[in-house]
Design a protein with these regions (language model features):
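Sec-dependent N-terminal signal peptides
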Residues: 4-13
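Structured beta-strand/loop patches that form or line metal/cofactor-binding pockets in enzymes
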Residues: 24-70
Length: 130
């Protein structure tokens, strides 16, 4: 019974997040760029590290993606909200991976009957940054 409740609660949470309007994002030092169905909120370089913050499509459960890149290597990816275990897994798996390889592996992944997913949104953001 507990497993059913947890699965039902997770399904409700993801469905509710899917049906919500996109989260409004605050302006940062760099201009907000709207591309496709996601927004690049900030894109800054400090001490050789490129810091990117993006809000993914309202079609996915996550609400923010934070990316750190040095050269062409992804150093860190952190998702806010969404499926926590999967988001941590994505970040751990692509740490140290080249941007091109991450795009190749994540591009086009869907989530259920949705046309996109959290990994696909990351690949779209990375494509835009190239």
């Amino acid at each position: 019974m507990k497993k059913f409740f947890i699965v039902a609660a997770l399904a409700f949470f993801c469905t509710a997040a899917y049906s919500q309007e996109p989260v409004k994002t605050a302006q940062t030092q760099s201009a907000e760029v709207v591309v496709d169905d996601f927004k690049i909120v900030s894109d800054e370089v400090k001490d050789g590290v490129r810091y990117i913050v993006a809000t993914p499509s309202a079609k996915v459960c996550s609400k923010k993606i934070e990316i750190e890149i040095i050269g062409d290597t992804i150093m860190k990816v952190v998702y806010t909200r969404g499926c926590q275990g999967n988001a941590k897994g994505i970040g751990a798996l692509i740490k140290g991976m080249s941007v091109d390889e991450a795009i190749r592996r994540l591009d086009g992944i869907t989530c259920g009957n949705r046309p996109t997913s959290c990994p696909d949104q990351l690949s779209r953001v990375l494509k835009t940054l190239k």
